[in-house]
Amino acid sequence: MQIYLANPRGFCAGVDRAIAIVNEALLRFEPPIYVRHEVVHNKFVVSDLANRGAVFVEELHEVPDGSIVIFSAHGVSKAVEDEAERRDLTVFDATCPLVTKVHIEVAKFAQDGMDAVLIGHAGHPEVEGTMGRFNHRHGGQIHLVENESDVEALSVQDAERLAFVTQTTLSMDDTARVIDALREKFPSIQGPRKDDICYATQNRQDAVKDLAGRCEVVLVVGSPNSSNSNRLRELAERMNCRAYLIDNATEMNKSWFDGIQSVGVTAGASAPEVLIQEVLQQLQNWGGDLPSELLGIEENVTFSLPKALRIPMTQVGK
């Protein structure tokens, strides 16, 4: 059985930064270090950080006044930010800079009194944070749509003063269809200068298309609550390739590969390489060949840590 390995795969720059922020905070400060929501959507990563002292909570009221809290990579609403300031919390913001870019876009549309349309998945923390960045005091409204049917039912205040943004981890193909529907219904709608779907999401979706074109089965390493990982599985399935989303190698079933000559492996942007290697090892234990890594776009994006976490340890407290 041939094994193909997608490239790029796994951690993106935003995830690297978010995990590094928690790690640095754990090194520099006395516990407890609170993290609002899973810092990234991966069970292995969250469990590892929790074992080293991070305390994960869902809401800010679970964090005692005056404590250290880290906001997850998905971002938070302005109300959460304001509450943290009111309660004298020391905040390290692990929001991905590409999510922050969308927050800035939304805030500008609100400031201009426009309506905004957010393309995204209801209930996802990134969507909740972005919706919460829209200030209604200037007369505008923000609307959430997930698909073309939502666009068909959408009613806005002024179709001539309307803009859209998107969640960063969506399917590129699905989003393109929703944007087309918006432009058809609202010809004057404004959009971002550069696509809001992040570079890592785009690159991993392109890579899984390549993978699915070669393989009978595709394994996506990622947690069930990871938006970008789910989109990878769905994309492989749309290319008529059987696909499974797995947290780790223990979730694999040997029967999936009965009579299979080729299998592909990729990973969502919040899945660490160690989990990918465990999957590859299990496939080889079941008779797979040495993995062949496919060519792909080389990623060299990096994001800086907050200034307070870049100060050399020898200067902390001076």
Curated annotation (Swiss-Prot):
List of residues binding (2E)-4-hydroxy-3-methylbut-2-enyl diphosphate: H41, H74, H124, T168, S226, S227, N228, S270
Positions annotated as active site in the UniProt record: E126
Keyword flag DNA-binding: no
UniProt binding sites for dimethylallyl diphosphate: H41, H74, H124, S226, S227, N228, S270
Catalysed reactions, as listed in the record: isopentenyl diphosphate + 2 oxidized [2Fe-2S]-[ferredoxin] + H2O = (2E)-4-hydroxy-3-methylbut-2-enyl diphosphate + 2 reduced [2Fe-2S]-[ferredoxin] + 2 H(+); dimethylallyl diphosphate + 2 oxidized [2Fe-2S]-[ferredoxin] + H2O = (2E)-4-hydroxy-3-methylbut-2-enyl diphosphate + 2 reduced [2Fe-2S]-[ferredoxin] + 2 H(+)
UniProt cofactor(s): [4Fe-4S] cluster
Cofactor note: Binds 1 [4Fe-4S] cluster per subunit.
Function statement: Catalyzes the conversion of 1-hydroxy-2-methyl-2-(E)-butenyl 4-diphosphate (HMBPP) into a mixture of isopentenyl diphosphate (IPP) and dimethylallyl diphosphate (DMAPP). Acts in the terminal step of the DOXP/MEP pathway for isoprenoid precursor biosynthesis.
Protein name as catalogued: 4-hydroxy-3-methylbut-2-enyl diphosphate reductase
Natural source organism: Psychrobacter cryohalolentis (strain ATCC BAA-1226 / DSM 17306 / VKM B-2378 / K5)
Gene this chain is encoded by: ispH
